[in-house]
């Protein structure tokens, strides 16, 4: 049994239920091709390439009376608002859609996508839904939740088969999961639960969700006691170690030279995870899990998690403005479930 699954699902995992772990490299079948002209239209002409959509063959087997897709609607760096058809086309989808959707978001610009319902990638997903997914019996169960007092509060629960189910959830998520600050913060401190975040691939949600609220020349300090790798698999991890978070121009040039063929999602991640020199990104990590020289080798700053835990005391701390010895900072206890922006900025 998978200890991570057991920890996440609790008693549900102990029941006589079959849990299938999706292998996006080997478990999929092609369902349709999104034509080049549709992709170009969806991206405003910035991306011209046909995309193959795939699904896990178990979803396509016809053995089930009903397919239920459950997930949380929350701001997302690739599709704008997470879940709905993303749960299928990426969650149990294949390499091409995963790679191309990530690259589209990087090229179009993360600031124009985060927290928005109608985005280039969502329009591509809508095409696949209209031309294939609507043939399947899929019920979407979508939640809108917020972190509150060390727990998650459920604010909305939407059930249906139509696009409007997702749109309704998005309208609530825009109100509950986007925080508007009165000004840009010179310093933002975020907390990553070690039980959830073991890689920068996942941990960099702290970068994506806060970047629009950090002042030029400011700093993002990520308290990450569980960080021990960069990628979630060896292929992506080695790619991150090779190129580092070296900035949009460097990564995009490498991409255009064909250096990321078949692993475009890594290129997109490296673009999303760079501040392009606008602000400093520092990971506070356990030196036994992530040594200083390794973290610095990919372009991030590093500091020891021990002293930072004593200084900022993140456990039990609520999101908000704080001051430490004359230094003002904004603390975020759960960056992965929100988006922080500044009032008056587009």
What are these regions (language model features)?
Residues 197-289:
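C-terminal catalytic subdomain
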Residues 29-36, 78-83, 151-156, 201-202, ...:
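Short acidic, glycine/serine/threonine-rich loops at helix termini
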Residues 276-346:
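Extended hydrophobic packing segments that form well-structured cores
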Residues 2-13:
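Single conserved hydrophobic/aromatic residue that forms the stacking wall/gate
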Residues 72-75, 194-195, 287, 335-337:
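Short glycine-rich anion-binding loops that position phosphate/pyrophosphate groups of nucleotides
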Residues 68-70, 187-191, 221, 330-331:
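Structural motif
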Residues 15-180, 212:
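Conserved, well-structured core segments that form the ligand-binding/active-site neighborhood
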């Amino acid at each position: 049994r998978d200890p991570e699954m057991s920890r996440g699902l609790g008693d549900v995992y102990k029941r006589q239920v079959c849990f299938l772990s999706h292998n996006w490299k080997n478990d999929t079948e092609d369902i349709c091709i999104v034509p080049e002209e549709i992709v170009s239209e969806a991206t405003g002409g910035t991306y011209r390439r046909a995309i193959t959509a795939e699904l896990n063959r178990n979803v396509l087997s016809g053995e089930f009376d009903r397919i239920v897709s459950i997930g949380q609607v929350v701001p997302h760096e690739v599709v704008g608002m997470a879940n709905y058809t993303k749960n299928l086309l990426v969650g149990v989808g294949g390499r091409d859609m995963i790679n191309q959707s990530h690259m589209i978001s990087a090229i179009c610009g993360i600031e124009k996508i985060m927290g928005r319902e109608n985005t280039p990638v969502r329009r591509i997903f809508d095409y696949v839904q209209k031309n294939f997914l609507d043939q399947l019996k899929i019920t979407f169960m979508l939640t809108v939740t917020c972190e509150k007092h060390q727990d998650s509060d459920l604010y909305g629960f939407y059930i249906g088969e139509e696009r409007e189910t997702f749109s309704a959830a998005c309208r609530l998520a825009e109100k509950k999961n986007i925080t508007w600050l009165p000004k840009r913060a010179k310093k933002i401190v975020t907390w990553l639960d070690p039980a959830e975040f073991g890689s920068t691939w996942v941990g960099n949600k702290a970068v994506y969700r806060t970047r629009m609220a950090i002042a030029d020349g400011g700093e993002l300090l990520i308290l990450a006691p569980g960080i021990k790798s960069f990628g979630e698999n060896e292929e992506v991890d080695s790619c991150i170690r090779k190129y580092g978070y070296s900035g949009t121009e460097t990564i995009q040039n490498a991409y255009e030279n064909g250096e990321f063929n078949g692993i475009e999602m890594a290129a997109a991640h490296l673009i999303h995870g760079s501040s392009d020199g606008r602000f400093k990104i520092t990971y506070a990590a356990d030196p036994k899990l992530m040594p200083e020289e390794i973290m610095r080798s990919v372009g991030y700053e590093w500091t020891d998690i021990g002293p930072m835990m004593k200084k900022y005391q993140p456990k039990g701390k609520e999101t908000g403005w704080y001051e430490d010895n004359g230094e003002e900072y904004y603390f975020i206890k759960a960056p992965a479930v929100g988006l922080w922006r500044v009032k008056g900025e587009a």
